Amino acid sequence: MIIPLLPWYVFTMICEMGARGVLAVVLGSGFKIILTGVILTVLYLVIQYCIAGAIAGKNPFKCIWNMLPAYFTAFSICSSSAAIPVTSDCTRKNGIPDDIVDFTIPLCSTVHMCGSTIKLAVSAIAVAYLTGTPLPFAVYIHFVLMQGIAAVAAPGVMGGVLMASIGLLESIMGFSPDQTALVMTLYLALDGYGPACNVTGDGAIALIINKFFGKKQTPSVQ
């Protein structure tokens, strides 16, 4: 009921801030903020797959290549849950058997929100600096840790992590309604790369799960 109305709320807040001249301060740096988020999510995936590849004994970059259809599907539809069929097919190409895929991918689509968490953290920290309210480093760490917990309970749909973390923006970061609306604007400006990172990372988790709990004889990476 709430999430479909979120764009309208953000739109009204943007209009009000635009009339007061606040919006231009943040959106002037919007491209840099989004680019920073994209770079961090890609770096996260490379590290994640290097670790998973070392554990599973597979080429991490070949595994990432096999997961690209899932990445671009989630990027286009902005949803981890809706991309489950494509993510499952891509994970099988990495040599993961059906029983591991059918357990890991649906579960991770609702609890593994790494990309969305990174994106929201970047947006929140950027807004804090751009609005002249930088906070101690310990506050950022506290926010990121609590946000990671909140993301586990968030639905795998567009804006799910954002809605689950609004209370943290106000209670931990001390954001005003205007600052919270700016975070929403940056978060939703290019929502796709968060879910894209989420589903691609699910494949790395499947590699690790298969190593410890899968059958010894598994198909090779295609």
Residue ranges of predicted features:
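Membrane-interfacial loop-to-helix junctions in multi-pass transporters
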Residues: 1-3, 39-40, 54-63, 94-101, ...
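Signature of multi-pass transmembrane helix bundles
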Residues: 1-62, 219-222
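Membrane-embedded alpha-helical bundles that form the substrate/pore pathway
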Residues: 3, 73, 109-116, 154-157, ...
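Hydrophobic/aromatic residues in alpha-helical transmembrane segments
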Residues: 7, 11, 47-48, 87, ...
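Small-residue-enriched core segments of transmembrane alpha-helices in multipass membrane transport
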Residues: 30-48, 66-73, 141-154, 162-172
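Helix-loop-helix junctions within the multi-pass membrane cores of secondary transporters/permeases
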Residues: 69-151, 206, 219-222
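Transmembrane alpha-helical segments and their short flanking loops
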Residues: 121-222
